[in-house]
Amino acid sequence: MPIKDKNRIDEKFVEDNVKKFLIKDGFLDNGKRKESWEHGVDIKMKHRDYGSYYLVECKGEPGARGVVKSFSGSMSSSINSAIGQIISRMHTKRRSRYGGYNFSVAFPVSFREKVIKRIPFYACKNLRLSLFFVEHNGDVEKITWSELKKIQENR
């Protein structure tokens, strides 16, 4: 049966709360909002004190924008899409450890278990990729490659 739920977390909610999280961590918001038809990452923020950037691809829950037939299938497709989109934006020469680009994918908390099972920690380590999960109340959890390694080893 098709699912549409107005209580699902949409992409804008994920994006807004990840931005708030990064601002608290010292990153600057340029105030620009990417339209759905525009190309590029959903969030690009520079640290206020040094040349480090965060590039984040955000996804919302299936059913937040319209009817879906398979929640799980749509969720898997969203995960694959986010990973592909962020990897396709890794065209940078800035590779220094403390200045350069940090890449991330951000999802609603309902994606957490599936993403943790799907993305290997060593891929996150080599790609400088972190994970963000947004709760219904707006709280954000950030998981780095080393935290992901501990989670995956304890399963």
What is each residue range found by the language model?
Residues V18-G26, I86, M90-R94, P120-C124:
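Hydrophobic, Leu/Ile/Phe/Ala-enriched alpha-helical segments that form helix-helix packing faces
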Residues E15, H39, A82-Q85, V115-I116:
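Amphipathic coiled-coil/heptad-repeat helices and related helical stalk/stem segments
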